[in-house]
Swiss-Prot record:
Keywords: Cytoplasm, Elongation factor, Protein biosynthesis. This is Elongation factor Ts. Associates with the EF-Tu.GDP complex and induces the exchange of GDP to GTP. It remains bound to the aminoacyl-tRNA.EF-Tu.GTP complex up to the GTP hydrolysis stage on the ribosome. HAMAP family: EF_Ts (MF_00050). Belongs to the EF-Ts family. It holds the Pfam family EF_TS. Residues 79-82 are annotated as: Involved in Mg(2+) ion dislocation from EF-Tu.
């Protein structure tokens, strides 16, 4: 079968691949567009597998609250530029919808889920081949509760807040506060004993180095430890929208309590590859001479 311009155009529209790639694929498939797509998809998957080894530390956080379920996903890319790509954003939107509908809590289940008749893992491979970067759903969580709030700041920090009592506005305000203040625990009493002991050791050392007597240093540190546990816990912090009141006071006034919260930040815990620009240029120049 002849490879026509119309066939090349159709293949480009269906695969988003380059014109030359589409023409070559059609020639190899003797004009059979379905076979060409199959071959290109196989090729795309091979490229995706190769790119999967790259570090994906940029990306976006997505949240959704519906039907008593709050869901949050971190979807990673290699660069911030791709994180703003329409195809990347559309893929993320589909992921959050399927994760919310099925209350998904692990990446394996998410990758095995189906969107638009295609497995998420296959859709991801196709997108990687199209965009040319490693793309990876990194983590997902779905929680149920009576009063759920979600907040995303700049696409990079996302929070789910689980409350008992209060209203929707309060739940969202608490999620917003967690995004901004980054508390490590819900209440001061939740701070583990080993964390308190370590901080006390540090503060005692600081006090003793300042020349304070041991008994005075101990009293000073006791006051500092109360401040420390308040600063690292949600309810002990000053409310971000009204610093004159604490989060604990706000919750009491609203007859509410925070059961828990979950905070995602894009790329946290991922060690980004440090690029040596001079070495990269030298390598490119050496390759060009070959």
């Amino acid at each position: 079968m002849a490879v026509t311009a119309a066939l090349v155009k159709e293949l480009r529209e269906r695969t988003a691949a380059g014109m030359l790639d589409c023409k070559n694929a059609l020639v190899e498939a003797n004009g059979d567009i379905e076979l060409a797509i199959e071959n290109m998809r196989k090729n795309g998957q091979a490229k995706a597998a190769k790119k999967a080894g790259r570090i994906a530390a940029e990306g976006v956080i997505l949240t959704k609250v519906a039907n008593g379920v709050a869901t949050m996903i971190e979807l990673n890319s290699e660069t911030d530029f791709v994180a703003r790509d329409e195809g990347f954003i559309a893929f993320g939107s589909k992921l959050i919808e399927v994760a919310s509908a099925n209350k998904i809590n692990d990446i394996e289940t998410l990758n095995d889920s189906v969107v638009d008749g295609v497995k998420v893992s296959d859709a991801r491979d196709t997108l990687v081949a199209k965009i040319g970067e490693n793309i990876s759903p990194r983590r997902v969580i779905s929680v149920e509760g009576d009063n759920l709030g979600a907040y995303v700041h700049g696409g990079r920090i996302g929070v789910i807040a689980i409350l008992q009592g209060g209203d929707e506005e309060l739940a969202k305000d608490i999620a917003m506060h967690v995004a901004a203040a980054n508390p490590q625990f819900v209440k001061p009493t939740d701070v583990p004993a080993e964390v308190v002991a370590k901080e006390k050791e540090i503060q005692l050392d600081i006090a003793m180095q300042s020349g304070k007597p041991a008994d005075i240093a101990e009293k000073m540190v006791s006051g500092r430890m109360n401040k420390f546990t308040s600063e690292v816990s949600l309810t002990g912090q000053a409310f971000i929208k009204d610093p004159s009141t604490s989060v604990a006071q706000l919750l009491k006034a609203k007859n509410a309590d925070v059961i828990n919260f979950v905070r995602f930040e894009v790329g946290e815990g991922i060690e980004k590859k440090e690029e040596d620009f001079a070495a990269e240029v030298a390598a490119q120049m050496a390759a060009a001479k070959k």
